Regions:
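Active-site-proximal loop/hinge segments that shape catalytic or ion-binding/gating pockets
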Residues: 245
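Acidic, Mg2+-coordinating active-site environments of NTP-dependent enzymes
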Residues: 1-76, 93, 97-116
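Beta-strand->loop->alpha-helix junctions that form or flank phosphate-binding loops
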Residues: 31-32, 44-66, 83-87, 114-121, ...
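Nucleotide phosphate-binding/pyrophosphate-handling subdomain across enzymes
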Residues: 2-3, 10-13, 76-189
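Acidic, glycine-rich flexible loop segments
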Residues: 242
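Short, surface-exposed connector motifs at secondary-structure boundaries
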Residues: 19-28, 158-164, 186-189, 235-236
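Generic structural signal for well-ordered alpha-helical scaffold segments
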Residues: 19, 101, 152-156, 227-232
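C-terminal helical cap/extension that packs against the catalytic core
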Residues: 31-53, 68-71, 136-137, 145, ...
């Protein structure tokens, strides 16, 4: 629901705006959505005489995962490897593969092997990006409730027994209270920072909100202070994640 002032305030309106990019006689590759959203996309594809392809999430089979990546099967592919972490990235990979399979019809050089290699080489800066292993330190661009839920789910799955430490900074126009409530459920400690922006929420104000859910909060004057203190004060097996906007 980001950018609601521009796209609309409900899923149907947002989908209709997004569907505006569909061109006549084109190809549409869809990440499976709710029934109401898919109806909008299907109608737009029909109106523009475009072919619609939908990734088949039911054919995804996760085989192994760890901080260095994941191995999974999808459709006719076996033992695909990706560096991106989290089950949601398997779905993103499935959509990318579906798009490549459509492009194979028009572009020479795209083969199952090049798709396999491309998926393995894919990187996404700031999306559960591992920047250090000692201590384990991630940065994630989660800046809304949905993004934070995905981040929390990933951390819980990968590190069920580890203490989780968060460095958080947000803009004051974000729904940060909802974000805090979601993260606090798994948090051992927070370091709050003030983003470099005129719209930034001061670290102290963010800390006041966090204290409603977690007593272990440290206010930092600068972002670099939050990073340094979190890294220095982390104990063995602690996991640090910096997120926000």
């Amino acid at each position: 629901f980001d950018h609601m002032k521009i796209l609309g305030d409900n899923l149907t309106q947002i989908a209709r705006e997004k569907a505006g990019i569909i061109k006549e006689n084109g190809n549409v590759v869809l990440y499976p959505q709710s029934e109401e959203v898919e109806k909008v996309i299907e109608d737009a594809a029909a109106q523009t005489s475009s072919r619609l392809f939908k990734a088949d999430f039911a054919s995804i089979k996760l085989k192994s995962f760890g901080i260095d990546g994941q191995i999974f099967d999808y459709s006719t592919f076996t033992d695909l490897k990706i560096k991106l972490l989290g089950r949601h990235q398997l779905k993103n990979a499935a959509v990318a593969i579906a798009a490549c399979q459509v492009l194979k019809e028009k572009m020479q050089g795209i083969t199952d092997e090049t798709i396999r290699k491309g998926i393995a080489k894919a990187r996404w800066k700031g999306r559960m990006e591992l920047v250090c292993k000692e201590p384990i330190f991630f940065i994630d661009g989660a800046h809304n409730e949905d993004g934070v839920k995905v981040m929390v789910d990933t951390l819980e799955e990968y590190f069920p027994q580890n203490r989780k430490i968060f460095i958080m900074g947000v803009l004051k126009d974000k729904e940060y209270s909802k974000m805090v409530k979601t993260v606090a459920r798994i948090a051992y400690k927070f370091y709050t920072v003030t983003p470099v922006s005129e719209r930034a929420l001061p670290a102290k104000e963010l800390a006041d909100v966090i204290k409603m859910y977690c007593d272990n909060v440290i206010i930092c004057d600068k972002i670099v202070e939050g990073i340094e203190r979190a890294a220095e004060e982390a104990e063995e097996n602690d996991v640090i994640c910096a997120f926000g906007s």
